């Protein structure tokens, strides 16, 4: 974790993995998904500000997640890291996420 105690959101694109025969021999198990790092966004609250976190995510859910239900998911850790995964097929939503973070900072 960084020295800052603000929440950080890692934005990843998730896609089905296509493995060729040559690569398959190097893998112990066949991965189901591939994740591509897109961006790291700093959120406007600290890890000890749970009320602010909940309020912010209520709005984030309403504006970003619910309209894209089934194609977006996130995990929030207690150490200030949020991992947001979007299906590759809705890659254009990344810009909406960035705009949301900027406008709600």
Swiss-Prot record:
Coiled coil: none annotated. The modification N-acetylserine is found at residue 2. The lineage of its organism: Eukaryota, Fungi, Dikarya, Ascomycota, Saccharomycotina. Transmembrane segments: none annotated. This is Uncharacterized protein YML108W. The keyword Ligase does not apply. Keywords: Acetylation. GO terms for cellular component: cytoplasm; nucleus. Present with 2610 molecules/cell in log phase SD medium.
């Amino acid at each position: 974790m960084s020295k800052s105690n603000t929440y950080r959101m890692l934005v990843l694109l998730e896609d089905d993995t296509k493995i060729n025969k040559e690569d398959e021999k190097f893998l112990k198990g066949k991965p189901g998904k591939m994740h591509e790092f897109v961006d790291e966004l700093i959120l406007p609250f600290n890890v000890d500000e749970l009320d602010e976190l909940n309020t912010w995510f209520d709005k984030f859910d309403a504006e970003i997640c619910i309209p894209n239900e089934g194609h977006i998911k996130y995990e929030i850790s207690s150490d200030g890291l949020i991992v947001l995964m979007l299906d590759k097929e809705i890659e254009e939503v990344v810009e909406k996420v960035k705009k949301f973070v900027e406008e709600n900072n």
